[in-house]
């Protein structure tokens, strides 16, 4: 089995897929895509017309899969190593998939709105859209804070797809929309940052941190207090 992951090391959605692959102890060949390079972008668009990463290509199976959630679920079915990621019981699996949708739609999407808006020319900024994104985050933080425990993972006692979906956006959000006032969420981020699968993602991302469009009001990156110097 030969897996190729088309990705960028700084992408939070790529981290989601990478965490799943690492957790399932699946070896893969990383293929870095530079969307700022016309040739790289054109070649990638030939694989997936939307030119959005991650995309996983399983050479042995002849399968090409876009979308981080789909890749994570595929990884979960390829290996019995590590956590299941998706529970076997239908009702438990449905709960995990609901968390995955919640985290993508109400954490990841607002994150992309806030960060993406900073890349626009000054005259094209969307202040209203950013405010709406921050309001969505406030609701999501409150919801997650009410559901998290002090020792478990995002969706219960077992590490799952929900954690692969939660860790990457929370890491970046801790800078642009701080978690202060949500102690359980802060402790969760600290806990998941110690997870080897996520630490590998952060290690790969570190050389590219200058890509992040910083703002004077931003918090610093999570630091040694969380045992990761980014």
Located regions from the model:
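GST-like domain detector, emphasizing the conserved glutathione-binding G-site
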Residues: 1-131, 227-230
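Acidic/histidine-enriched, glycine/proline-rich intrinsically disordered or flexible terminal extensions
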Residues: 205-230
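A local structural micro-motif
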Residues: 29, 83, 156, 200-201
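Short, flexible loop/turn segments with low-complexity composition
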Residues: 88, 200-208
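Short, solvent-exposed turn/loop segments enriched in Gly/Ser/Thr/Pro and often Arg
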Residues: 8, 34, 161, 205-206
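Juxtamembrane/interface motifs at transmembrane-helix termini
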Residues: 25, 114-119, 182, 207-208, ...
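GST-like fold's C-terminal all-alpha helical module
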Residues: 99, 103-196, 203, 230
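A short hydrophobic/aromatic micro-motif that marks alpha-helical segments and, especially, helix-coil
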Residues: 82, 119, 178, 209-212
């Amino acid at each position: 089995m030969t897996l190729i992951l088309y990705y960028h090391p700084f992408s939070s959605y790529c981290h989601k897929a990478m965490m799943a692959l690492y957790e399932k102890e699946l070896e893969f060949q990383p293929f870095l895509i530079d969307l700022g390079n016309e040739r790289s972008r054109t070649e990638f668009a030939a694989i997936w017309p939307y030119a959005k990463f991650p995309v996983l290509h399983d050479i042995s199976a002849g399968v090409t899969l876009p979308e981080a959630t789909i890749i994570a679920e595929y990884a979960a079915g390829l290996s019995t190593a590590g956590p299941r990621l998706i529970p076997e019981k239908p009702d438990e699996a449905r709960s995990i998939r609901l968390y995955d949708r919640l985290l993508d739609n109400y954490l990841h999407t607002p994150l992309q709105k806030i960060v993406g808006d900073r890349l626009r020319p000054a005259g094209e900024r969307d202040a209203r859209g950013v405010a709406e994104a921050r309001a969505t985050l406030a609701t999501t933080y409150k919801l997650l804070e009410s559901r998290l425990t002090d020792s478990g993972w995002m969706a219960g006692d077992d590490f799952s797809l929900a954690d692969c979906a939660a860790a990457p956006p929370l890491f970046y959000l801790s800078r642009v929309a701080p978690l202060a006032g949500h102690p359980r969420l802060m402790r969760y981020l600290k806990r998941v940052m110690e997870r080897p699968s996520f630490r590998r993602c952060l290690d790969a991302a570190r050389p590219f941190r200058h890509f992040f469009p910083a703002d004077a009001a931003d918090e610093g990156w999570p630091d040694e207090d969380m045992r990761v110097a980014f």
